[in-house]
């Protein structure tokens, strides 16, 4: 199955070792330095719900994971570089042993206010695609794994079509979306997802932190056709 088919069918495509080792190492070293120099325990809720190392977001070591890496060619093939924008990257860390036992992961889609993520209620802050770049190995379940619900992008599409535009002002939907898959990843692996794919991070019962950087990508005219893209999920895509 090629990545086009995997993305359309399952809602995500996994590219093992796609990121050059030099870029992954530079990003990891920058994150480690920032944690050592700037970590503030009083900001832990912000780190967990928005981003670790906020001062590092948008910096060359982080942005190079997207802009100087092969994933950018895939984004271009899928959406067209001239048609999209992107954010400064979210530095996401699941600390080792952050939970005492394995618990089933709970899905979400981005862009809904949680009271902790800095978003205002009454609107969906959707985007178009998500790129995850993994900087530490994730070799078994419940190790902070990026977790997906394959095919759930179509379930959410059907939900929005049935619910109608009032869903734009409502809390995050929670339809039945099937079984979760916890992805195992090596350093430099990349996962490219449709925005509407249900996903989360599993708890980390492993001995090492899980470090990843996520980039949100959006069609430049998304604000004008946000509802259209929620109910016709391949609108604007080239694949």
Go through the PLM ranges and name each one:
Residues 41-44, 74, 164-165, 190-192, ...:
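Non-heme Fe(II)/2-oxoglutarate
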Residues 104-112, 148, 198-202:
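Histidine-centered catalytic micro-motifs
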Residues 58-64, 119, 175-181, 200-202:
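Active-site rim elements
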Residues 1-9, 15-119, 236:
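Non-heme Fe(II)-dependent double-stranded beta-helix
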Residues 112-135, 140, 149:
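A contiguous catalytic/ligand-binding core that recognizes phosphate-bearing ligands
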Residues 12, 88, 126-130, 143, ...:
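Extracellular structured ligand-interaction cores
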Residues 125, 138-200, 222:
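Double-stranded beta-helix
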Residues 24-25, 94-95, 100, 140-142, ...:
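Short catalytic/ligand-binding loop motif for oxyanion handling, primarily in non-cytosolic enzymes
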């Amino acid at each position: 199955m090629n990545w086009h088919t995997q993305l359309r069918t399952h809602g995500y495509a996994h590219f093992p070792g796609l990121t050059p080792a030099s870029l992954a190492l530079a990003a990891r070293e920058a994150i480690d330095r920032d944690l050592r120099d700037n970590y503030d325990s009083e900001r832990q809720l912000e780190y967990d719900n928005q981003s670790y190392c906020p001062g590092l977001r948008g910096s060359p070591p982080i942005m190079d994971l997207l802009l100087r890496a092969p994933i950018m060619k895939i984004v271009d093939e899928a959406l067209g570089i001239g048609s999209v924008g992107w954010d400064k990257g979210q530095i996401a860390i699941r600390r080792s042993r952050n939970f005492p036992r394995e618990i089933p992961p709970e899905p979400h889609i981005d862009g809904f206010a949680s009271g902790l993520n800095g978003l205002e209620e009454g609107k969906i802050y959707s985007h178009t695609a998500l790129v995850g770049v993994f900087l530490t190995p994730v070799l078994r379940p419940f190790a902070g794994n990026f977790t997906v619900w394959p095919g759930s992008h179509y379930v959410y599409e059907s939900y929005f079509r049935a619910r109608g535009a009032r869903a734009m002002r409502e809390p995050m939907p929670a339809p039945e979306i099937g079984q979760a898959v916890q992805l195992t990843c090596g350093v430099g692996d990349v996962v490219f997802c449709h925005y509407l794919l249900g996903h989360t991070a599993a708890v980390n019962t492993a001995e090492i932190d899980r470090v990843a950087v996520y980039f949100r990508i959006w069609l430049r005219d998304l604000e004008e056709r946000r509802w259209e893209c929620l109910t016709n999920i391949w609108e604007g895509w080239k694949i």
